[in-house]
Amino acid sequence: MTSHLCCSNYSSPLPELLVCLHTEGSLTALLEVKAGQPLRVERSFEGYRLLSLAQKKQLGMQGAALSRPRLAWVREVQLYGNDELPWVQAQSLFPLSSLQGSARRLQQLKSTPIGYVLFKRSRTLPNQRFIKHTVDGWQRQTLYNWYGRPLLISETFLPQFCEKQLDI
């Protein structure tokens, strides 16, 4: 019943979830506090994919760049706290143009939470955030400006997280 409160088709998320959706800084750090342990990351996909038109627009591409095929390094993971079921489903999009120099390490994350890398030197990063409801739950899509490079990260809060961790 409580998962319906968090992840049903309400016009806005409950206040308990709003804290997670709008947290500035590392979501990884917030989730690890809630779990009382490091997050476990399971990768479901990691590799190159063509960006969709919507993704190109979200990444700030304009004009002729929208009509050209663009590759990105895509990482899709499930984040586990202290439960058997995942708490968050996440997708990270790194346009190839963003993977220059030391940013290439973003292709080598394996089971490391991305928050460990993005927020290593700074507690917050310049970003634009969009919140929406999906069939899987409430999602935050954040376009980060990481050292002048755009990175798009989508994080969907799954029913298990809402039910067990938000006390709703």
Curated annotation (Swiss-Prot):
Its EC number is 4.1.3.40. Belongs to the UbiC family. GO terms for cellular component: cytosol. One of its GO terms (molecular function) is chorismate lyase activity. SUPFAM superfamilies: Chorismate lyase-like. Its main location: cytoplasm. Pfam families: Chor_lyase (PF04345). HAMAP family: UbiC. Removes the pyruvyl group from chorismate, with concomitant aromatization of the ring, to provide 4-hydroxybenzoate (4HB) for the ubiquinone pathway. Keywords: Cytoplasm, Lyase, Pyruvate, Ubiquinone biosynthesis. The gene is ubiC. Pathway: Cofactor biosynthesis; ubiquinone biosynthesis. GO terms for biological process: pyruvate biosynthetic process; ubiquinone biosynthetic process. This is Probable chorismate pyruvate-lyase. It catalyses: chorismate = 4-hydroxybenzoate + pyruvate. It comes from Psychrobacter arcticus (strain DSM 17307 / VKM B-2377 / 273-4). It comes from the Bacteria. It is found in: Cytoplasm. It is an enzyme of class 4 (lyase). Substrate binds at R75, I114, E155.
